[in-house]
Structure formats: structure tokens, C-alpha cells
């Protein structure tokens, strides 16, 4: 691990249920948080995952959240969610995130006896604002990539070209009377 030389005076606080409102408010105003990180959603599987979510403060101001759980000597971000990773304030810079990772490693090793971190990033397509400081920090800390998942998206305004097979199947559906229409009658 590469030591970070700047002392940004970051502090880690382990999340407790009393901090739910603060957590949820932060997620709602972050640059990369999604509904998956709201506590009601996260706590749905609380019986299956030993929650060890963390809150990072800089000078008394909440700057980042890390939804996480631990199992044996491994910390996951977060095993009960589709994706995890640091949820960042608009004030979180690359330097702050690098320092947060360094502090995270020290904290987990010293406090929780964790020897391994499995970090899953938030796919960029879900960001409210471009935010890949965590990827840079992982590179700087010589993290090892063990898995790569794909994220694909179709932007409705731009459309997506259909393949020949898809066009043929759409034509068959129309010929068989299939119609897609919008309806407000939900009782039907």
C-alpha cells in the first residue's frame, strides 16, 4: 500500500441505526448515490449480512459513506447489494478519496481484524455527476482487479438500432396483432 502523505484529518464512524436520517439525506444529495443505498432498502437483508457500513467525516462534515458488511476476515462493499462503493459528497476530491481508502485499510485491519477488502464500484451510468475518484485510488493503492461486470444502457432520446432478427420479430408481432399502448386503466 502506498502511504498518503497529506493529513486531511478524516475520521471514520461506524454506522448505527440512529444515523439513518443523516445517512439517507447524504445519499439523496451525493454525486453518485442511488436508491440502493437508502437504509430501508439496505436493511431489507440485514439478517443475512453483518452490516459494517462506515461514515467518513472531514473537519466535522460528512464527506463519504461506504455501505459494507463483513464476513470472517473479509470486508465487502456491500455483499447484499448489486453494487457498492464509496458514496461521495460533491466536496470529495481524488485526494480525499485516496486518503479515505488508506484510512479504511488501517481501520479495518486494526479495529475489525479484516485482512481483505472486496470493493465493488458504483457503475458510472448511475452517477448524478461524474465520479470515479475511487478507481484512481484503487490504482494508486495497487489494488487487484478480480472481477469485471458489465453495465449497459440505452438512452431513450438517442434510441438504439435494432438488429435484422429483432426487426423481423417485431414485424411478426405486429402481423399477429400485438400492440403496445399506454393506458391509465390499471383495473383492466
What residues fall within each predicted segment?
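A residue-level signal for conserved active-site and pocket-lining positions in enzyme catalytic cores
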Residues: 23, 60, 119, 180
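Conserved donor-binding loop and adjoining core beta-sheet/short helix segment
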Residues: 5, 25-28, 40-111
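Short Pro/Gly-enriched beta-strand edge/turn motifs at strand-loop
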Residues: 33-41
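Conserved GNAT acetyl-CoA-binding A-motif
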Residues: 112-123
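Acidic-and-aromatic substrate-binding clefts and catalytic sites of carbohydrate-active enzymes
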Residues: 94, 125-130
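Acyltransferase donor/substrate-recognition loop-hinge adjacent to the catalytic core
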Residues: 1-20, 131-188
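Short, internal active-site loops enriched in acidic
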Residues: 122-127, 159
Amino acid at each position: 500500500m502506498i502511504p498518503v502523505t497529506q493529513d486531511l484529518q478524516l475520521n471514520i464512524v461506524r454506522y448505527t441505526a440512529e444515523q439513518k436520517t443523516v445517512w439517507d439525506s447524504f445519499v439523496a444529495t451525493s454525486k453518485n448515490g442511488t436508491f440502493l443505498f437508502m437504509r430501508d432498502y439496505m436493511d431489507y437483508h440485514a439478517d443475512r449480512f453483518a452490516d459494517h457500513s462506515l461514515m467518513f467525516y472531514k473537519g466535522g462534515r460528512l464527506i463519504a459513506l461506504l455501505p459494507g458488511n463483513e464476513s470472517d476476515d473479509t470486508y465487502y462493499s456491500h455483499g447484499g447489494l448489486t453494487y457498492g462503493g464509496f458514496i461521495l459528497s460533491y466536496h470529495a476530491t481524488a485526494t480525499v478519496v485516496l486518503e479515505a481508502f488508506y484510512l479504511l485499510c488501517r481501520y479495518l485491519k486494526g479495529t475489525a481484524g479484516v485482512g481483505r477488502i472486496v470493493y465493488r464500484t458504483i457503475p458510472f451510468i448511475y452517477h448524478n455527476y461524474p465520479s470515479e475518484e475511487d478507481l484512481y485510488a484503487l490504482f494508486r493503492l495497487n489494488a487487484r482487479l478480480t472481477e469485471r461486470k458489465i453495465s449497459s444502457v440505452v438512452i431513450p432520446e438517442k434510441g438504439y438500432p435494432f438488429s435484422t432478427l429483432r426487426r423481423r420479430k417485431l414485424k411478426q408481432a405486429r402481423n399477429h396483432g400485438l400492440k403496445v399502448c399506454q393506458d391509465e386503466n390499471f383495473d383492466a
